[in-house]
Amino acid sequence: MKVDLNSDLGESFGRYKLGLDEEVMKYITSANVATGWHAGDPLVMRKTVRLAKEKGVAVGAHPGYPDLLGFGRRYMKLTPEEARNYILYQIGALHAFTKAEGMELQHVKPHGALYNALVKDEELARAVIEGITDFDRRIIFVMLSGSRPAEIAEEMGLKVAHEVFADRAYNPDGTLVLRGKPGAVIHDKELIAERVVSMVKDGGVKAINGEWIELRADTICVHGDNPKAVEIAAYIRRVLEDEGINVVPMGEFIR
């Protein structure tokens, strides 16, 4: 049994430092690197790719809305043509750095409000997926487990890593509980690890109302921008390995 651990990294910008990339990188297997539109800049992108190479961590692009002030967490209405080309542009930017460092670009995971918008907007999802296929049909698309965009990507011939979230509560329909609602974010590391093991080994987890929901867990997102990020990432990895689950980059088992 195999699973990937991913985290959103490279989200500093200019003089502003965000996240604990160097520490979190010790425990994950795939890094989603910001591509300059919601966070990140050329220097940060190259530094993050180099760090991933040094740590043996696979690299993926983490494109978002062009919204530095809002950190890509504010919805923007895009035409399909805009969405397709925005994604292609951002993937290409990160690919320049992975190529310069002798690395392959493993995956693409949309960021923040864009990620959430894809779940609700099939036309937008198709446009984003087309932007990915324009770049390389062999690349892995990381998307919310069981969601319609994941299905569309598979229908369009892309490899998909179904993603679950370590520290987030789920609605009965498999979507994430909005951050502002009570109980949306889980902070207890033992509970987080228990839920992660359930998702990987049992194929599901209890929703916020106690109802069991089925989830395919190819990759687990651990957030790298909170004070307990390193502690939680280390604990999750240790518990998974103690359970006999191999923690490896998604590219090793997503075919």
From Swiss-Prot:
Protein's UniProt keywords contain Lipid biosynthesis: no
Top-rank EC class of the record's enzyme: hydrolase
Recorded catalytic activity of this chain's protein: 5-oxo-L-proline + ATP + 2 H2O = L-glutamate + ADP + phosphate + H(+)
An annotated Gene Ontology molecular function: 5-oxoprolinase (ATP-hydrolyzing) activity
Keyword tags: ATP-binding, Hydrolase, Nucleotide-binding
Top-level division of the source organism's lineage: Archaea
UniProt GO BP: carbohydrate metabolic process
EC annotation from Swiss-Prot or TrEMBL: 3.5.2.9
Role: Catalyzes the cleavage of 5-oxoproline to form L-glutamate coupled to the hydrolysis of ATP to ADP and inorganic phosphate.
Family to which the UniProt record says this protein belongs: Belongs to the LamB/PxpA family.
Subunit structure: Forms a complex composed of PxpA, PxpB and PxpC.
Name used for this protein in its record: 5-oxoprolinase subunit A
Native source organism of the sequence: Thermococcus onnurineus (strain NA1)
Gene from which the chain derives: pxpA
